[in-house]
């Protein structure tokens, strides 16, 4: 009988997890269905930074017969997930929140909200700042006689890779705050390692962007600035731990 009672909480959690995952899937499907009619318009919007700087008369191409149909559909599915992120995060939060203490909830609320905003900011930065600069540079430096005709599927893969790279890298402040909050490191220790972190930012930029110094620099510089922002905000999360440690030391000295 006791084994049955002990298994009940686990079964309850699994049922709740299934229900929340089902809600996430339904949300993404509904958004996708609402957007699928506009799939070609969505692709044109994403491709606009490239088509705006292409030479007169140049167009994008499709090297496979099924590509013009499946590529916009693929993009629409990804956009549906992208739009659904706040709801998906809410479902995740609703599942794990009951296991957290009240002070942990107060600390995580702003982190969860800001991480979502930072990811969206990273994607927007890539689209409105990086794409026009990179595509303009590439089209202007093309050898004479070379016609730019980018495959629509290759462009989508390229754009999604940059969107993901910039979105993730804009989470640097959140990573720093979590590292300092959990006691893995401190603001002072990270500040002392600043030269190495700058080098690491350019190395990460080299790995996540196309093989050119221009794209690498456009990713590394925001990462360095966001690193400084993370250090600034992390100071508000760390002192409480320091104060509690000092109090514990004082109490231990008094008992001795």
From Swiss-Prot:
GO cellular component terms, A-Z = TAT protein transport complex
Q: Where is the signal peptide?
A: none
Disulfide connectivity? none
Keyword Transmembrane helix attached: yes
Q: Which GO terms describe its biological process?
A: intracellular protein transmembrane transport; protein transport by the Tat complex
> PROSITE patterns, alphabetically?
TATC
NCBIfam families in the cross-refs: tatC (TIGR00945)
What name is this protein filed under? Sec-independent protein translocase protein TatC
Gene that encodes it: tatC
